[in-house]
């Protein structure tokens, strides 16, 4: 299937679940990116999960963001239980604006959900010639050594930096081993 055809299908699914046009596009782009880079665990395989969370009112399909400005370089976003793609997209765009204006841009986000590959957002900043860091917490998924019960989240972290010899360098990792 061609990328454009797949995007239309994903877009329609999110629209059916009451996301606005712009947010449906943001989600579709992020999911397709995960598939293109081979991170299928963060692509189409998660689509049903997002839809189920919307149906269960765990994701607000029409969030109203609240922004608190701490300084010319630091913002805090209450994403109003937004789907993570939309909150992360907004946050990285704001961080880029702040960094271009003041030299550093920090945006904290609360009340959002799973946002897919953090490297996807890092890449946006690196393409603007900025060094970028992105990290989040996650629910318990890892058991301590010798234990049976999960206590630690995977807590993804990614970073990226412009590189003179290639377009960009990014790393996207988590605290867990690949299974």
Residue ranges and their predicted role:
Residues 46-91:
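Active-site cofactor/substrate anionic-group-binding motifs, chiefly glycine-
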